[in-house]
């Protein structure tokens, strides 16, 4: 999207009015002709690109101190807010997955191409470059609404916040979809069939499905997870089973030791226990996110843990806030590193 002269003039006027900079300074630098000011101090950029993986290299900084973060597509966090001192320049790179639809697989198509938002408390961008990265590794995510790229604030899936932990060369391909179970994820061609066709040898595939398997019996649940694992392996991918994030449902003693919190369904199927046992029997890596999130919620207690979920905003103790998704994504990233599921050089 090349700026018209009128838009360029408006952009320069807005920058001069909003930036705490010396006279004549453009805090966004030069060469950003795919970008326009939003009116809130941020910079929105659009690139007409086909679906695929792309490297983004950005030089942050300016004549005055700044702090810049980058998000993109459907509210994906791509680069954590990064401070720069006056006169400092910092180069950062990451890889982004561009797909259609851009968010949830069964959701709205969104905008074709790549959209980036350069914001933060004081955005300072000197240059921006986007180049094809056809050989990048994709880290696929299979899951439900607790994982997906949620389109509307304040709902946020942990998969939406995971990209900030990855360096250039690995892109999160979040194919999680709200409301899906092991049954529906396999049945809908827009879901697993699409993921399966895109997997290349060595691509990690994280699988977290449980919240919506409310009436799935144990044998069927195990069979569906086994099918997912085996079909990923058949493509040369590296499946990783992930136990579900807990619900914020406290006992009187301040623990989460109950079926609602720990995802035991109406048939008495203990999903986390089934996943742990299956991972052991199949020799599949396991990220025990149930145990990790349980420990975090219990550590915070009944009151402080509300901030991790949408308890206050929506009376929702299942779906995470931006803060909760951010913390849970960090737990997943730490496990990817600790278990060697991604090379250490790929993680920030």
Positions of PLM-derived features:
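Structural recognition of the beta-strand scaffold that forms the well-ordered cores
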Residues: 138-143, 147-148, 171-176, 203-209, ...
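Oxyanion-hole/transition-state-stabilizing segment in secreted/luminal serine hydrolases
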Residues: 187-223, 246-249
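Solvent-exposed loop/turn segments at secondary-structure junctions
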Residues: 62-64, 145-149, 177-183, 211-216, ...
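Alpha-helical scaffolding segments of alpha/beta enzyme cores, especially the outer helices
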Residues: 194, 223, 227-230, 234, ...
């Amino acid at each position: 999207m090349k700026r018209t002269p009128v838009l360029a003039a408006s952009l320069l006027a807005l920058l001069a009015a909003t930036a705490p900079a010396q006279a004549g300074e453009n805090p966004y630098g030069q060469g950003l002709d795919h970008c326009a000011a939003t009116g809130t101090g941020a910079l929105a950029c659009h690139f007409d690109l086909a679906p695929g993986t792309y490297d983004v290299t950005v030089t942050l900084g300016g004549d005055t101190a700044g702090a810049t973060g980058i998000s993109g597509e459907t509210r994906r966090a791509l680069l954590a807010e990064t401070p720069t001192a006056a006169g400092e320049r910092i180069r950062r790179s990451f890889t982004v997955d561009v797909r259609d639809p851009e968010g949830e697989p069964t959701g709205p198509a969104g905008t074709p191409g790549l959209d980036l938002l350069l914001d933060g408390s004081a955005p300072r961008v000197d240059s921006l470059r986007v180049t094809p990265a056809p050989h990048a590794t994709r880290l696929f995510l299979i899951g439900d609404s607790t994982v997906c790229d949620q389109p509307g604030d304040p709902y946020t899936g942990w998969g939406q916040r995971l990209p900030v932990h990855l360096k250039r060369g690995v892109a999160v391909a979040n194919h999680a979809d709200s409301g899906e179970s092991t049954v529906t994820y396999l049945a809908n061609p827009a879901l697993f069939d699409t993921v399966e066709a895109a997997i290349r040898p060595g691509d990690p595939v994280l699988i977290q499905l449980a919240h919506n398997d409310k009436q799935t019996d144990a044998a069927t649940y195990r069979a569906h997870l086994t099918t997912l694992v085996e079909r990923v392996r058949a493509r040369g991918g590296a499946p990783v089973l992930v136990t579900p994030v807990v619900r914020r449902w406290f006992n009187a003693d301040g623990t989460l030791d109950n079926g609602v919190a720990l995802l035991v369904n109406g048939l008495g199927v203990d999903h986390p226990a089934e996943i742990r046992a299956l991972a052991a029997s199949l020799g599949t890596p396991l990220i025990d996110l149930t145990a990790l999130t349980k420990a975090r919620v219990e550590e915070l207690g009944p009151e402080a843990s509300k901030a991790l979920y949408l308890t206050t905003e929506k009376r929702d103790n299942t779906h995470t806030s931006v803060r909760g998704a951010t913390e849970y994504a960090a737990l997943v990233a730490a496990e990817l590193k600790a278990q060697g599921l991604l090379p250490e050089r790929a993680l920030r």
